[in-house]
From Swiss-Prot:
Catalyzed reaction equations: a nucleoside 2',3'-cyclic phosphate + H2O = a nucleoside 2'-phosphate + H(+)
Gene that produces this protein: CPD1
Organism: Debaryomyces hansenii (strain ATCC 36239 / CBS 767 / BCRC 21394 / JCM 1990 / NBRC 0083 / IGC 2968) (Yeast)
Keywords: Golgi apparatus, Hydrolase
UniProt signal peptide: none
Name of the featured protein: 2',3'-cyclic-nucleotide 3'-phosphodiesterase
Length: 237
């Protein structure tokens, strides 16, 4: 039995099983409507991500360093290890956020303003891009890419400071609050499995666990946790 499966038994219901991971960014822009485009998007994103991580300084051993165990009210942060805000990790997350979340969204917004004839409203009231044959008519006004790229970079940098919260989840659950008796049991389990004393100490910024390489995965996180789908993966070296 792993630590995570052991901790799951302490919580009510049946907490979902998932791989231990650190979320770099959510809302990655992938075309899910056309299988061929989905495949090419996934390949492009993972390839660019490998280039990005290879470009970071090779000045220390661990990209990921685990710290204290903590808990929040949120389902997805019920029980987790804090992760140190390593400069390389933050830089990598910022690059991914800029290229594959902020920039595509900003380009789309600008196109809606400059070229409204390219868009229509679907049956749910959402603004969507017309299919290619529907959007052939009308002049296309160019958008200011240098400005958009600069603004996307600024927004991603701001996100890395105000929102990026690296952590490694151990349990997903709705239980709140965690009482002192359960918390003591959690600490004992972690100590038994990982030999970490005082695992919830505020002074614990490095519990001795960490790594530099690993596997980068692009995951479709829709619906139940057990239904999440790995769209693609790449080894980090």
């Amino acid at each position: 039995m792993t630590l995570m499966s052991s901790l799951n038994t302490l919580f009510p219901g049946q907490p979902p099983k998932f791989e231990p991971h650190i979320t770099i960014s959510s809302n990655i822009d992938v075309d899910l409507d056309h299988p061929d485009k989905t495949k090419s998007d996934v390949y492009r994103i993972l390839s660019a991500s490998l280039v990005a991580i290879d470009s970071l300084p090779k000045n220390h051993s661990n990209l990921v360093t685990l710290g204290k165990v903590d808990s929040q009210r949120k389902f997805f942060k019920k029980l987790y290890f804090q992760v140190a805000r390593d400069p390389n990790l933050v830089s990598f997350a910022t690059i991914i956020r800029e290229l594959f979340v902020q920039l595509p969204a900003d380009i789309e917004q600008e196109n809606m303003k400059k070229n409204p004839h390219l868009y229509t409203t679907d049956s749910h009231g959402n603004t969507v891009k017309k299919k290619s044959k529907q959007s052939q008519d009308g002049r296309i006004e160019a958008i200011d890419m240098p400005r958009i790229q600069s603004e996307a970079q600024e927004q991603a940098s701001l996100w890395s400071v105000t929102e990026f919260d690296p952590h490694l989840s151990l349990v997903y659950n709705d239980l709140h609050p965690i009482d002192s008796a359960l918390w003591r049991t959690i600490k004992t389990r972690i100590q038994d499995y990982l030999n970490i004393d005082n695992c919830d100490s505020d002074d614990l910024t490095d519990n001795g666990l960490g790594w530099d390489n690993g596997i980068l995965k692009l995951v479709l996180c829709e619906g139940d946790v057990n239904d999440w789908v790995v769209l693609g993966s790449a080894d980090l070296h």
